[in-house]
Regions:
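Beta-sheet repeat architectures centered on beta-propellers
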Residues: 1-125, 408-416, 420-424, 430-650
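Beta-propeller and closely related beta-pinwheel folds
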Residues: 59, 63-70, 109-110, 311-462, ...
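Hydrophobic or amphipathic alpha-helical targeting/insertion segments
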Residues: 116-147
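Extracellular carbohydrate-recognition regions
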Residues: 147-164
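Short carbohydrate-recognition loop motifs
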Residues: 168-194
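Extracellular ligand-binding interfaces
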Residues: 192-276, 295-300, 573-592
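Extracellular beta-strand elements of beta-rich domains used
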Residues: 266, 286, 303-307, 638-639
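Short beta-strand-plus-loop segments that form exposed binding edges in beta-rich domains
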Residues: 287-295, 624-630
Length: 650
């Protein structure tokens, strides 16, 4: 923005012009010393090509797309055809997926912690994790623990169940229902016949190791009264179609059972063998038998049975990927730990496939992201780069190396890491926004230091995303004294402009691709999933936009000025904008000076020429252009102020 002050030959008539390009917010100095091109304040406005205009709003992404409870995750899974499925989670321990018309359960009964999930798609699965519940994978159909192979989930799609049983929609751990079996004193046997025989040996994918008898079979079972369960004749069985060759385990070997839910975990080697050669690779029938003691009645509901490696990647705070390998960071064994799965086999993890990054340096891993041929690992007070050589090596002996990037900047939040223009990585520290270009970490937020520096709480909640259509990176954060992300700071990397925004509570930001379009999705504290850069309101609430020009004075700030009028150009539109002004005779008065309305301009009126009468006398003047009705508008510079310098100094 060019600030030109023209003084007439008489030495009294004064014309001040604000010309493009405008450069966005500069909150580092007082309004009287804002550098050329910057603004002391701008809210809910964009500056494409340096021309100010009201920002585009947000709309509900899909009818009914509101997640219940306090949400802790918004993630996207992509099918092989690139079709997205959206996942969400909340603090009541529920994980959902969006069917296109409703949120539907994937898992229930997980931790009720406020810990946020981290997510990353690796190959054909979306991997999600938090440090309480562990690591899970979604394949487009179901959500299973990492390392698990599906056996049966008791959902309605499994239609080949035989025997007396019913769908239990009350006692459920996975999906929409469990499989309930009732015994009234005699054994009740219920069988499931998979469409294709189950191979409970072959590992998942082309490179994962095979399952052995040292691995485990797990399932959930809800028992209403364990004292009435005959554990000797209640069993699970996996075998051939004729029930002549099978592996069987009675409830006496399921571990300690209690009333309510029990998560049974048993070694394959613990199953008794019937017949000469039952084979784990061709399981054609899965049977559940429930028996009550004497003439008693007992109810048992089974849910979510799977085979899983005995050793799986531990629960961690952050997941990313590298060379098609799942990377998990900051785990339950150490906050500096990095774990890595076998290439192209995210389920397959070895206890030796782990190493620390800058261990015992006093800070923990906050986040990380793949970057070309490296993974950038951000700790509280430092950043590091790790590389790997996998060719010519055998897992878990991949060769990893690490090198420090900087100890001047750390990180505040994994979810603040955003890939921007030129494949640069941007993220928040506790008091800065920095950029990594593959060589060094540089601070980029100098112009808005006072805006960022007061942050003291909820640093972990800072979230970032990219609005490609506007050449912008977005970060939502919690200002001092608030408990939700009520502020947004946007960076227009084409104009190198910082653009604040208020009016939304964006607890998460997420980039997605749908039908070839890049989307920036967000979720509010009320669980509403919004598409940013869409519509003219913030989710039906009018957008209040404002633009504050720098303070101006005559050539001699000690001389009094009579401010006659301002001329504000604008594009034809609907609605109105209001031009306000405030005055001061000394810089110390600026902080408490209040705005007065000069005039409201009708944007569609052909007679409206944008001339605004001021008629005030002071040494300093500041103009503000504001719109509170949400009507879209564009300012067409220059903005001009006409004044006359008074002969008297007071």
């Amino acid at each position: 923005m060019g600030l030109n002050v023209d003084l007439a030959e008489n030495g009294l008539d004064l014309t001040i012009r604000f010309s493009p390009p405008f450069r966005g917010l500069y909150s580092r100095s007082t309004p009287t010393s804002v550098p050329d091109g910057f603004l002391p304040d701008i809210v809910n406005m964009d500056i494409p090509s340096g021309i100010p205009e009201s920002m585009i709003g947000s709309t509900l992404f899909a009818t009914g797309m509101t997640l219940t409870g306090t949400h802790t995750m918004l993630a996207t899974y992509y099918s092989a055809a690139g079709v997205p499925t959206y996942l969400g989670a909340n603090t009541t321990g529920e994980v959902y997926y969006w069917t296109g018309s409703a949120w539907t359960y994937l898992l229930r009964g997980l931790s009720t912690s406020t810990l946020w999930w981290s997510d990353e798609q690796v190959g054909n699965v979306l991997v999600i994790t938090n440090k309480n519940d562990g690591i899970f994978k979604y394949d487009g159909t179901r959500l299973l623990p990492i390392g698990a192979k599906h056996i049966c989930d008791m959902e309605s799609a499994e239609v080949t169940w035989a025997g007396t049983n019913s769908a239990d929609t009350v006692n459920v751990k996975q999906g929409l229902q469990g499989r309930k079996i009732t015994s009234t004193g005699a054994a009740v046997v219920v069988t499931f016949t998979p469409a294709t025989a189950l191979d409970l040996i072959d590992g998942i994918g082309p490179t994962a190791r095979d399952y052995t008898t040292a691995d485990r079979i797990k399932f959930w079972v809800y028992i209403d009264d364990t004292t009435k369960l005959d554990t000797a004749t209640t069993y699970i069985r996996l075998g051939n179609a004729g029930d002549t060759l099978y592996f069987q385990l009675t409830a006496a070997n399921w571990g300690s059972l209690a009333n309510g839910w029990n998560h049974v975990s048993v070694l394959k080697s613990a199953f008794a063998i019937t017949g000469v050669t039952p084979v784990w690779s061709t399981i054609a029938k899965v049977s559940f038998a429930v028996d009550a003691t004497g003439a008693n009645t007992v109810n048992a509901t089974f849910d979510d049975m799977y085979l899983v490696y005995a050793s799986t990647m531990p629960a961690c705070s952050v997941v990313t990927s590298f060379k098609n390998s799942l990377i998990g960071m900051n785990d339950t064994s150490g906050t500096s730990n990095v774990n890595f799965a076998r290439v192209s086999a995210p389920d397959d993890w070895d206890v030796l496939a782990t190493f620390p990054v800058a261990e015992n340096n006093g800070d923990a891993i906050v986040g990380g992201k793949k970057y070309y041929d490296q993974v950038v690992v951000v700790k509280d007070q430092s950043a590091h780069s790790i590389y790997a050589t996998v060719s010519g090596t055998t897992y878990p002996a991949y060769r990893f190396s690490q090198s420090p990037i900087t100890s001047a900047y750390g990180g505040a939040s994994h979810r603040s890491i955003v890939e921007g223009d030129g494949a640069k990585l941007y993220w928040w520290t506790a008091s800065d926004i920095v950029m990594y270009d593959g060589t060094s970490v540089q601070k980029v937020s100098t112009e808005v230091d006072p805006t960022i520096a007061p942050l003291a709480t909820r640093l972990w909640s800072i979230v970032g995303g990219r609005l490609r259509a506007k050449n912008q990176l977005w970060w939502a954060y919690t200002p001092v004294g608030a408990t939700t992300n009520t502020k947004v700071l946007r960076y227009d990397y084409a104009q190198q402009a910082w653009l604040p925004s208020t009016g939304q509570t964006l607890e998460n930001l997420m980039n997605a691709t749908s039908s070839g379009s890049d989307l920036l999705l967000s979720i509010t504290s009320a669980g509403r999933v919004l598409q940013q850069g869409s519509g003219t309101t913030f989710d039906t609430t009018a957008i209040s936009s404002s633009l504050d020009l720098p303070w101006v004075s005559g050539p001699d700030p000690e001389r009094m000025v009579r401010w006659h009028e301002a001329a504000v150009g604008f594009a034809d539109s609907t609605g109105t904008i209001t031009v306000k002004y405030r005055t001061a005779d000394h810089p110390r008065e600026m902080a408490t000076a209040s705005y007065s309305t000069a005039q409201t301009l009708t944007l569609s009126s052909s007679s409206e020429k944008g001339r605004v009468f001021i008629g005030a006398r002071s040494r300093w003047l500041q103009l503000q252009i504001i719109n509170v009705t949400g009507a879209a508008f564009q300012i067409l510079p220059p903005v001009t102020i006409k004044a006359i310098i008074l002969k008297q100094r007071y």
